[in-house]
Amino acid sequence: MLTVGQKAPDFSLPGVDGRDPGMYDLHRFLEGVDATVLAFVPSAHAPVCEDDLRALGAAGWAGREELLVWAITGDSIFANADAAEDLNLDFPVISDFHAGVADSYDVRLEDWHGHRDIPGRGFVVVDPDWTVRHAWQTDPFETPTPPPLDAVAAALSDLGVAVDAPAVEYRAGD
């Protein structure tokens, strides 16, 4: 995974905001915001990844003008549209189907339980100068303590974007 202080790579990927498809070019959206949160997951419906995304959506962070929030999955935009609806996500869910962007952020899983070249699970916070201010990665099925969104909220606060860390209810094993 990229480390704090490194420059975040630009990218352009297809995605959906709700059920509206479009292209998401990071450079077009990064300008004018104080911080960007990129949530990498292999699939929006992977058990603990789904819990993180649900909590991120419930937090309401995406409704803030100074903050950009995107989920980046290995799913198609069709599956992402369903996930956005099922999880009530208020931010774009973007398809990195071949894990090219995940590779540039060094969060690609080469071979994970029979799945090859998929985005791993991680969170990256980027400042307006494209500098990585927070980076975290773990196994897609791990239930971390504390939840990764606690550290994401702290990194946002350091950038002057005061947000509350959402409570994450992990349902792994259901």
Enumerate the predicted regions with their spans.
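Chalcogenol-based redox active-site neighborhoods
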Residues: M1-D174
